[in-house]
């Protein structure tokens, strides 16, 4: 080791200060998109993928039945006959 270097200073990554911060570092910052109600499915998908890159978008008719399983990488878009989002898209 060279004189004057300190290996502990090579990685200056701040640690979480509390339990809540530790949990938040692994979860998306946004879990729903109420501002997308009324836009087309394509516009909503584009906006969501800008904020959550590895998301799977599932488009369904607003009156359809879907499985009740929770998927943290999925956002469902419920659309009407004109392909406009009718419910707030959210993770699940």
Curated annotation (Swiss-Prot):
It holds the Pfam family potato_inhibit. GO terms for biological process: response to wounding. Residues 1-31 are annotated as: Disordered. PROSITE patterns: POTATO_INHIBITOR. The keyword Transmembrane does not apply. Coiled coil: none annotated. The record marks 68-69 as: Reactive bond. Gene3D superfamilies: Trypsin Inhibitor V, subunit A (3.30.10.10). It comes from the Eukaryota. Residues 1-12 have a biased composition (Polar residues). Inhibitor of subtilisin. Belongs to the protease inhibitor I13 (potato type I serine protease inhibitor) family. This is Subtilisin inhibitor 1. It comes from Phaseolus angularis.
């Amino acid at each position: 080791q060279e004189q004057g270097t300190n290996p502990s200073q090579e990685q200056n990554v701040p640690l979480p200060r509390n339990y809540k911060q530790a949990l938040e570092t692994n979860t998306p910052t946004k879990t729903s998109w109420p501002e997308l109600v009324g836009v087309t499915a394509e516009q909503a998908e584009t906006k969501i993928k800008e904020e959550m890159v590895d998301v799977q978008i599932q488009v369904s008719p607003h009156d359809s039945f879907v499985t009740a399983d929770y998927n943290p990488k999925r956002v469902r878009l419920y659309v009407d006959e004109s392909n406009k989002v009718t419910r707030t898209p959210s993770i699940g």
